Structure formats: C-alpha cells, structure tokens
UniProtKB/Swiss-Prot annotation:
One of its GO terms (biological process) is tetrahydrofolate interconversion. (6S)-5,6,7,8-tetrahydrofolate binds at L120, G124, H125, L126, S354, P355, F356. GO terms for cellular component: cytosol. It is an enzyme of class 2 (transferase). Homodimer. HAMAP family: SHMT. Belongs to the SHMT family. SUPFAM superfamilies: PLP-dependent transferases (SSF53383). The modification N6-(pyridoxal phosphate)lysine is found at K229. The lineage of its organism: Bacteria, Pseudomonadati, Pseudomonadota, Gammaproteobacteria, Moraxellales. This is Serine hydroxymethyltransferase. CDD domains: SHMT (cd00378).
Length: 417
C-alpha cells in the first residue's frame, strides 16, 4: 500500500518548485499566445486514477482488458469534439499538437513527398516544414510566406509555388499570424494541383469553436489542433476530418499503432471536459473578449508609434516589430520578464536578426482574458509594455511597472484562494 504522504512531506524540494510556479502564475501577467489557464475540473481529470489505465487501441477494439469505462470516456470525448467543430471524424488520442501533425504526415504522405507550408520565419510552425523538424527532414518542404507590404499571407505566392512544385499536401495554419486565413482559397489552390489540404488550427481552435473565426473542418481534408491555447483544456492534441472513409482509416492507424502506443486516458477525460465547456455561452463570450482585448492592445501600440505586423489583428495574437525602436526581441522579453510581464521573443517577416535574438515579440490575450481583464485593463497593460521598451529597460521604469502588475494581479487572481 502507498503511504498517504503529500508531495510537501515526501519531496519538499519538488514541492517548493511547484509552489513557486503557482506563485509565478498568480503574480505575473501571462501574454504568451499559446498559454492559458485550465479550469480546476480539467486539472482534476488530469490528476485522476485514469492515469493508471493502459488502453492501446480504440473504444471497443482494445488490446487490454478492463477498458469498459475508459471506452465510455474516450467515446464521450470523440462525440463532443465532432459536435463542437462540426466534424465527421475525430481522434482524441494524440498526446500533443506536434504528434497530431506527425500522424497526419504519416497517414497521407510517403517520405520524400513535397509539402507546401508556411515558413517558420513568417509565422508558421516547426511542423509545417521547418528544416530542424521531422517535417523538413523527412519530406521535401517548400515554404511560403507573407506579403512584405501587407504582412498578410501572399496567396499568389502560395498558388505559384503550388503550381511549380506540385506538392502532395498543402499546410495552412500558423503559430504567429494575426489575420483571418482564407481557408477556401487554400482549398482552391490544393484542388488545382491535386494536393491534400491540411489545416493546423491549434492557435485559433477556441475562436473557431465559439464561431468568432472561420471553421476549416469541412473545407480541409484533415484539421488538427492542440487542446490548450484558446481551447483552455489540457496540453494535448486532436485530429478532425470531414467524411472520407479512406482518410479516416489512414488516420486511425497512423495515430495507433503508427505514431503512438497507449493513449493518456486522464488527458482524454480532460479533453472531454474542455469540449463540454467550449459549447457554453460563457465560452463564446470569453472568445469574443479575447479578440476585443487583442485588438485594443494593438491599437495602443500603434498609437505609441510601434509597428504591428499586418497593421492589427483579427484573432487572439499579434506580432510587435521592434526594428524601428532598435530593440531586440530578446532584450524586450527580458525587460518585461523583470517587470513580471511574460511574452516571447519572435521573429518578424524579413527579420535581420537570428531566431535566437529576433526583432519582435509575440503578444496574446487568452490568459489575461481568462483572468478577467477587459479592454480597460489591457490598454493600461499595453501602455506599461511600451513604457518599459521605450525606456530601454530602465530599472526605475521596470520597478514602477512591476508594482502596477502586482496590484492588478491581486485584483484579478487566476484561481480563487
């Protein structure tokens, strides 16, 4: 039997590190676009006894006994995901977004096939063909980017590259793009060259679920997402598709046994909770506020003389170019971190600096909106960020902003004490 000992009793060193992270999350303002706060119910599911159960296979077709209850849980998650996103197929087993993407590649492509995806330097993701990723090492990756003048996807370039290279698959999606993607334009281009259209909507899945961003699921052949970020669920992945029996079979076998072994049943239960929450009116109102907050912040930066890539935002994030300020993203990240404001350095289109230094920062509003920030609070916050950057990291300015951050965090706690 296990002794009923708490972490703090058994491993005080680890307990202190966890407590410090708890404190950081409460006392710092989180603006990393891919981060959010899970509900207590999601965390309860992730910490449940479901973590003990091995369940290789799928509901009704397991390789282990004792799966009668986890079958119910996984089927609930599948059914809710399909209902939420209007999908005909859902696989809730991917451990993460990258694993979901990897399974799609495995299902639809052969090594060496040509893939057309957005360049990491222009707002794409590692798994969209970056040379350092499996997607760029295993496949012949061709990259498209943004229009230099508008900061928006250059669809003419996408079509030109597609006609030239005849990709087997086109990837639409992003990790740092602030405008609405024209999914149908991508579909039309893919159809011209006989390519699969694969959409990675990891960043905007919550917005899509709430109806405040276009839904790609019935346009693309396959769509993937993470379940955290704007969906506010566990750190995990999801694959969706419109009806196509051949593709569905390929996806099933690509996830298991092709790409993974046993699913994480505690995470799947947490996804089921997340999907149920995302069907609520409160969640829809939250997503609308996420976008309003991002737009309000972008307006403040523009008024302060900063360049926002593409001139604004239609979703939960935007890129702030610091080239005009002669400030690196790395420095801005560090200065703001000292003021208890968490962002991430990010390359901007045609960035003259390396990806380890960058000339910009990425700002997202999902987490601060979860805390309860509205336009008033985020406008103040944008002003504080501009103050810190304009001061070039002046210690007095940082200290002043840090005090303001502490006050507003105390007013808007993440979790009730």
């Amino acid at each position: 039997m296990f002794a009923n000992i708490s972490i703090s009793e058994f491993d005080p060193e680890l307990a202190q590190a966890i407590a410090s992270e708890d404190e950081r999350q409460e006392a710092h303002i989180e603006l990393i676009a891919s981060e959010n706060y899970c509900s207590p119910a999601v965390m309860e599911a992730q910490g449940s006894k479901l973590t003990n159960k091995y369940a290789e296979g799928y509901p009704g077709k397991r390789y282990y006994g004792g799966c009668e209850f986890v079958d119910v849980i996984e089927q609930m998650a599948i059914d809710r995901a399909k209902e939420l996103f209007g999908a005909d197929y859902a696989n809730v087993q991917p451990h993460a977004g990258s694993q979901a993407n990897s399974a799609v590649y495995l299902a639809l492509l052969n090594p060496g096939d040509t893939v057309l995806g957005m360049s990491l330097a222009h707002g794409g993701h590692l798994t969209h063909g970056a040379k350092v990723s499996f997607s760029g090492k295993t496949y012949n990756a061709v990259q498209y980017g943004l229009n230099a003048e508008t900061g928006e996807i250059d669809y003419e370039e996408v079509e030109r590259l597609a006609l030239e290279h005849k990709p087997r698959m086109i990837v639409a999606g992003f990790s740092a793009y602030s405008r609405v993607v024209d999914w149908q334009r991508f579909r039309d281009i893919a159809d011209k060259v006989g390519a699969y259209l694969f959409v990675d909507m990891a960043h905007v899945a919550g917005l899509v679920a709430a109806g405040v961003y276009p839904n790609p699921v019935q346009i693309a052949d396959v769509t993937t997402t993470t379940t955290h970020k704007t969906l506010r669920g566990p750190r995990s992945g999801l694959i969706l598709a419109k009806a196509n029996e051949e593709i569905e079979k390929k996806l099933q076998s690509a996830v298991f046994p092709g790409n993974q072994g046993g699913p994480l049943m505690h995470a799947i239960a947490a996804k089921a909770i997340c999907f149920k929450v995302a069907m609520s009116d409160d969640f829809k109102a939250y997503q609308k506020q996420v976008v309003k907050n991002a737009q309000a912040m972008a307006e403040v930066f523009i008024a302060r003389g900063y360049d926002v890539v593409s001139g604004g935002t239609d979703n939960h994030l935007f890129l702030l170019s610091l080239i005009k300020q002669d400030v690196t993203g790395k420095d801005a990240d560090a200065w703001l971190g000292a003021a208890h404001i968490t962002v991430n350095k990010n390359s901007v289109p045609n960035d003259p600096r390396s990806p380890f230094v960058t000339s910009g920062i990425r700002i997202g509003t999902p987490a601060v909106t979860t805390r309860g920030f509205g336009e008033t609070e985020v406008r103040e916050l944008a002003g504080w960020i501009a103050d810190v950057i304009d001061s070039k990291g002046d210690e007095k300015v940082i200290a002043d902003v840090k005090a303001k951050v502490e006050a507003v965090c105390a007013k808007f706690p993440v979790y009730a004490k």
